[in-house]
Amino acid sequence: MSGINWEAEDAKYIWHPAMQMKDNEVFPPVVIDHAKGCYLYDTHGKAYLDIISSWWCNLLGHANPEINAALKQQVDELEHVIFTNFTHKPAIELARELSELLPAGLTKFTFHDNGSSAVEAALKMAFQYQYQTGHPERTRFMCLPESYHGETIGALSVGSMDLYAKIFHPMLMNNIHFKGLDCYRCPYGKTRETCGVECFEDAEAAFKKYGKETVACIVEPILQGAAGMRIYPAEYLRKLRKLCDEYGVLLIDDEIAAGFGRTGKLFAIEHAGVSPDILCTSKGLTAGYMPMSLTITTDKVYDAFYDDFGTHKAFVHSHTYAGNPMGCAIALTVLKIMKRDHILTKVNENGKYLHEKLMQALGSHKNVGEIRHIGLIHAIELVENPKTKKAFDPSRRIGWHIFRKAMDLGLVLRPMGDIIYFNPPLNITREDLDKGVALCKEAVESVLGK
C-alpha cells in the first residue's frame, strides 16, 4: 500500500494512550515498521534505541528468534481454548516451573490478560478471602503514597497518583493511602545512607486506626515505577509484612513492572526476604510479545474458596483470554533463556556498569538532582536547583522536550514528568548502553545546556 500517509491516517482514527493528543500537532507518533533486538525502525528506515523496553515489557529484545520459534510452534498446535473446564500443557508447565522460582508459599495460579486485570483479581480475591473466613467487616485496602497499580477503577482505587485518579475520585473505593516514602525529598531530612525508615510511622498509625477494617495492603515492591522510578528501602517491606501479619491483613505484591529481573532479582520483593500472600506479574512475563498476567496466591487463601458447589464460595472471576497457550509458551521460553543465559547475573553486572557511565556523563550536570538505580533501571531526576531540590515549573515540560530531542537522535527516552530513565531489555549489550548514555547526554545538554 505505497503512497499512503500513515501519520495522517493515524491522526484520523487512533486515540493513543497516556498522552495529550493535541501534542501530535507538533510531535506526531512515529510509525514503526519493524524491530530487531534493542532497536525500532520507522517507515523511513531510521533506527531508535528502545532504552525503555517499550513501556518496560520487552525483556529480551524485539523479534527474539528463540521466542519467535516458540510462538510459531505453539500457534500451529493450539492458539486458544476456554480455560474453565479445560486446561493445556503450556499453562501447567508454566505454573510448575514458576512455582519453584517464586517467593515461598505461592502455589496457586490464576491467569489474566494484563497488569490491571491481575490487580483487579488480587483485590477481589483478597476481599472474598476475608469475607469467607469470617471477616465481612474488612472492606478497605491500604496502599503506598504515589503508588500505581493500573488504570481500571479498582486499580485506580489503590493507586495514589492524582495524574491518573483525581478526576475519578467520586467513582473510587474509600481506601487508606500512606504518606511519606519519597527518599529523594525525604520529609524527615534523611539521606539514603542515614535512613532509619522513619516514614514507616505513618503506616503504623494507619494500621492502628484502620487495621481491623482492612482487607489487604498492596505494594509496588522496592521500586515505584510510575512515580518516577522511586526506590525505597527493603526494611520498609519487612516492617510492612510484620504489621500485616499482626493485624490479619493480606499483603499483595504488585510485580508487574518490577518483576522478571528488572531489579536484579527475579521478583523485587526478594530484596526484602519476605513473601506476600498474593503476587501479580505481567509485562516481562511474556517479554512484550503477548498480553498475559498472573495472580498467584497461597494454599491458605485458595482453601477458603474450595468447597461444595452449593456454598457459592468459588472465585467467579474470568477473562476470555485467560491462560492463552501462546502466551504460556512464550513465558516458558523466557524462563528458559533467563536461566540458560544467566540473565540476572548480567543485569547486576551491567547495572553497575551503566550507573558508572551515567554518573560520568551526567552526574555533575547543573540540573541533575539524583541518578538512582536498582538492577538495570536508572532514573535521572532533573531539577531547577539540585541543592534545594526545587523542581522545574511543570509548564516548561523539560522532560518532554528532552524526549523530543532524544527521538531526533534515535533514542526512545520517554519521561515521567522531569524524570528520564533507562529500563532496557535485560540482554542489552554494553555497546548499546554506551550509545544510550551518549545520546541521553546530548539530548539533556541540548535542552538544558552543559
What are these regions (language model features)?
Residues 1-450:
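Conserved N-terminal phosphate-binding loop of PLP-dependent enzymes in the Aspartate aminotransferase
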